[in-house]
From Swiss-Prot:
Cited NCBIfam families: E1_like_apg7
A biological process term (GO) from this entry: protein modification by small protein conjugation
The organism's taxonomic lineage, starting at the top: Eukaryota, Fungi, Dikarya, Ascomycota, Saccharomycotina
Subcellular location: Cytoplasm; Preautophagosomal structure
GO cellular component terms given for this protein: phagophore assembly site
Record text about domains: The C-terminal 40 residues are required for homodimerization. The GxGxxG motif is important for the function, possibly through binding with ATP.
Mutagenesis or variant effect for residue 562 to S: Normal micropexophagy
Keyword flag tRNA-binding: no
Top-level taxon of origin: Eukaryota
Protein name: Ubiquitin-like modifier-activating enzyme ATG7
Family membership: Belongs to the ATG7 family.
């Protein structure tokens, strides 16, 4: 076989689906709109290759790592990824110009001789791609830039076992030598001694140069195209007569090539190397990995996608991780609980717990989107558990549980202490285990104990309450020092839901009429209040002080804007007011007296608040405040009527 061009087998690519998943992750979290070249690395196997197979370059999720451990049967191949932002950008790229530019990178390493120390500069690859992250589709095109040099094959000879035997031990020594792996695929052979190309200057271009090449192809009598740039390099350095020992470790015959440079190199190097499709045509490939990936993982990535787009396109400072990692407790799984949980899902929250002691009724599904008609049958399914199951159907990776328990209510006497104490203990445990608590119940007194506990355990607490055409959304102020409550500066913390009241919570549910038992409210009010409550929670997390953040109407309070304490909305005139109220020193839920009493007596304190109507008012001083206000009112009336009053009572009107 004489006077012929060198027979080459082209390189084929193999892309593990994990590579595309890694691209998606990096695109969202790191690269964003940056479409500059990104360094990657692939690998080629030279031992475990099937029969009659071309060189196969593999990439996977590890291709982006700086330090990769390779087996003794692999060579690393350096490359770049150019991932474009739109499919139009991909189409507009001048493919020939791009290929030539990559060839010039190889050519430069030959000009400056850096390739002699790092042969991987001669075997580089690139990927031009576009990632459709919503559709989980990837358009990509591999290229293996090969500089063109024309060589004439004078002789191609297979190596018999006896001919290759003298080289076997040398090959094993070479592969195990303490050299960078990038140096080992090709080498100089000098009297059966293998030498790195760093020593090329010791050899004269006038003599025939013997080189060894460890082939990564198994096609009979064809060299891997990885040899192309090595031969171009030698031609550039003036070597025109070369004998190539093509060594194979894959049960196919090794062979030698005696070659001579057929044409001088052109002044402008020409580059080939775009990968062809399975049909032998030039063109990109399409990978649709949606069917290959766990659907739950696809859902996870899709949820993150919208949030990450919001972050790096609009608000880079937004801390999504703190939102995602927050554990949220929803006290109430009805209308407000349903809508709040859906907004939280949209924000990427992964841990939501429901507490409710009700069952799904036939009036619920139309207003409460976590329930459907079948949940109303057979007496109704438990709301909390059903809501948790519904969230898992919407997003399987959510951690969600429902607890069917009754929150102990101030003014509602203890009737079954064992059960109510268990409910109390469970509530305390749940509040301790979570980062934020939403009070979404439909009665005033059910909010009392959670308000106390959130202050004692320093938890973010948000209340949402509805009227017919109005709503209240507010965040509770917390103690700055829960260990030493007596040292607390009350004037510097925000108030809670009960701070505007001059009476303690009492039983408001007994003997209610039908219109009082049902939530009578315009249907849209719940959506407004729920969305504002969830958004307020997200804004709180963006403030460094979290639950201790002061109320601020300035747009720069957080990266999301202002951070109010209260939002009161009215649908009759479509207005929303931002209000602020500091802690009330006689508050029945967050005053120093109440918090100290709870810390010292816990359940016994709660029992007294449940059993005795006036206990909280006496404890906090509200009883005295009411008495004093009644005396003051009486004295003012007497004054207005022109009646005399004693000097000792004058303090009430001065």
């Amino acid at each position: 076989m004489t006077s012929m061009d060198i027979p080459y087998s082209q390189i084929s690519s193999f892309v593990n689906s994990s590579f595309f998943q890694k691209v998606s992750q990096l695109k969202l979290n790191k690269y964003r709109l940056d479409d500059t070249d990104k360094a990657i690395v692939g690998s080629v196997d030279f031992k475990f290759i099937g029969k009659n197979q071309p060189t196969s370059l593999s990439v996977d999720e590890s291709s982006f790592n700086d330090n990769i451990t390779y087996t003794h049967a692999q060579f690393p191949v350096k490359g770049i990824l150019k991932n474009l932002n739109t499919v139009e950008d991909f189409r507009k790229v001048d493919k020939n110009e791009f290929l030539q530019s990559q060839g010039l990178v190889v050519h430069k390493s030959i000009q400056d001789r850096s390739c002699l120390k790092d042969l991987s500069k001669l075997t580089q690859f690139f990927i031009l791609s576009f990632s459709d992250l919503k559709g989980f589709k990837f358009i990509y095109w591999f290229g293996f830039p090969s500089l063109v040099s024309r060589w004439k094959v004078n002789k191609l000879s297979g190596l018999t076992e006896s001919q290759i035997e003298p080289y076997e031990s040398k090959l094993n020594e070479w592969l195990n030598a303490r050299l960078p792996i990038e140096q080992k695929q090709a080498f100089i052979i000098d009297n059966l001694e293998f030498k790195p190309f760093e020593q090329l200057s010791s050899f004269s271009p006038d003599d025939q140069l013997n080189i060894g090449f460890i082939d990564t192809s198994s096609i009979l009598n064809k060299c891997s195209t990885q040899l192309r740039n090595i031969l171009y390099m030698l031609a550039y350095y003036g070597f025109e007569n070369i004998k190539v020992y093509n060594f194979r470790f894959n049960n196919t015959t090794s062979f030698t090539l005696d070659i001579t440079l057929a044409e001088p190199l052109t002044s402008e190097p020409k580059t080939t190397g775009w990968e062809r499709t399975a049909q032998g045509k030039l063109g990109p490939k399409l990978a649709d990995i949606g069917a290959l990936v766990d659907p739950a993982r696809l859902a996870d990535q899709s949820v993150d996608l919208n949030l990450k787009l919001m972050k790096w396109r609009v608000m880079p400072e937004l801390d999504l991780d703190i939102i995602k990692n927050s554990k949220v407790l929803l006290l109430g799984a009805g209308t407000l609980g349903s809508y709040v949980s859906r907004v939280l899902l949209g924000y990427g929250v992964r841990h939501i717990t429901f507490v409710d002691n009700g069952k799904v009724s036939f009036s619920n599904p139309v207003r409460q989107p976590l329930f459907n008609f079948t949940d109303c049958l057979e007496g109704g399914a438990p709301k909390a558990e059903t809501a948790a199951k519904a969230l898992k159907l919407i997003f399987p990776l959510i951690t969600s549980q429902g607890y069917n328990l009754e929150v102990p209510m101030a003014g509602h006497p203890v009737t079954d202490e064992k059960r109510q104490y268990e409910d109390y203990q469970r509530l305390v445990t749940l509040i301790k285990e979570h980062d934020v608590v939403f009070l979404l119940m439909d009665s005033r007194e059910t909010r009392w104990l959670p308000t106390v506990l959130c202050n004692v355990f320093d938890k973010i607490c948000i209340t949402a309450a509805l009227g017919f055409d109005s709503y209240l959304v507010m965040r509770h102020g917390n103690l700055f020092n829960t260990e030493h409550i007596e040292a607390e500066e009350n004037s510097h913390r925000l108030g809670c839901y009960f701070c505007n009241d001059i009476i303690a919570p009492k039983d408001s549910t007994t003997d209610r009429t039908l219109d009082q038992m049902c939530t009578v409210t315009r249907p849209g009010v719940a959506l407004l209040a729920s969305s504002l409550a969830a958004e307020l929670f997200v804004s709180i997390l963006q403030h460094p002080l979290k639950s201790h953040a002061p109320a601020s109407l300035h747009d720069n309070a957080t990266v999301l804007g202002c951070l109010p304490q209260q939002l009161r909305g009215f649908l009759h005139n479509f207005e929303t007011s931002k209000l602020e109220a500091n802690n009330y020193e006689y508050c029945s839920a967050c005053s120093i007296q109440v918090l100290n009493e709870y810390k010292s007596r816990t359940w016994d304190f709660v029992k007294d608040a449940l059993n005795e109507n006036n206990y909280l008012e006496d404890l906090t001083g509200l009883t005295k405040v009411k008495q004093e206000s009644e005396i003051a009112e009486k004295k003012f009336q007497e004054f207005e009527n022109g009646l005399e009053f004693s000097d000792e009572d004058s303090e009430w009107i001065n």
